């Protein structure tokens, strides 16, 4: 093999890097809500469902650290606290994805062209469950945010991480609003656990 052919071969390190690119590392402090007051619920226990919804092969959010689903679950753990003597609450990640999408009317083939974007959708639900797992109430929050995509893998990872941080911050705000709107009778505002909710609380069929 002559020198010209040798110069055309990529370094082995480059090939290895392309074969297995690690997930992008987060920039700045980790996602956390421990600095905020707890949303105290008049339930005996809270279950954080760790199921990660599958949004398909174009989901960038599943490769982040934390992933989009994990970021939603961090919010649930940090914000919620059981402060009662009966019933149970379940926090569910309904959707958590950052998808690469083509904009309408664009026909380019590469992510470098401005017709591609990242679309983040986060949805969570808190359910109150009574005897026989009967649902006594629920609150659901969702946010959707977008950002231009990048052609470079590392740059796309940084953009996705920033987008996830903004979306989870907004989800936290929306989640607390929906909690106070739909489950206000289940919130404990004082220092002690509240008595069981009054009989007038509406029950919803599954």
Where are these regions (language model features)?
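C-terminal/domain-edge helix-coil "capping" segments
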Residues: 154-206
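Short secondary-structure boundary motifs at beta->alpha junctions and helix caps
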Residues: 60-62, 134-174
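N-terminal segment of the mature soluble domain
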Residues: 37-98
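Bacterial Sec signal peptide processing site at the extreme N-terminus
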Residues: 13-35
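Surface-exposed short loop/turn segments
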Residues: 87-138
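N-terminal export leaders
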Residues: 2-7
């Amino acid at each position: 093999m002559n020198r010209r052919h040798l110069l055309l071969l990529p370094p082995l390190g480059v090939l290895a890097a392309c074969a297995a690119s690690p997930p992008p590392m987060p920039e700045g402090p980790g996602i956390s809500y421990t600095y905020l007051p707890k949303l105290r619920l008049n339930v005996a226990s809270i279950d954080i469902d760790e199921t990660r919804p599958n949004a398909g092969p174009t989901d960038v959010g599943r490769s982040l650290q934390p992933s989009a689903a994990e970021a939603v679950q961090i919010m649930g753990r940090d914000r919620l606290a059981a402060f009662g003597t009966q019933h149970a609450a379940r926090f569910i990640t309904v959707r958590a994805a950052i998808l690469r999408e083509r904009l309408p009317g664009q026909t380019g083939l590469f992510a470098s062209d401005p017709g591609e974007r990242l679309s983040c959708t986060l949805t969570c639900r808190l359910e109150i469950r009574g005897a026989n797992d009967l649902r006594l109430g629920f609150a659901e929050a969702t946010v959707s945010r977008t950002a231009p995509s990048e052609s470079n893998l590392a740059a796309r990872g940084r953009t996705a991480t920033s987008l996830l941080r903004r979306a989870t911050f907004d989800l936290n705000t929306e989640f607390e609003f929906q909690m106070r709107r739909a489950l206000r009778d289940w919130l404990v505002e004082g220092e002690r656990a509240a008595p069981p909710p009054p009989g007038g609380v509406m029950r919803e069929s599954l």
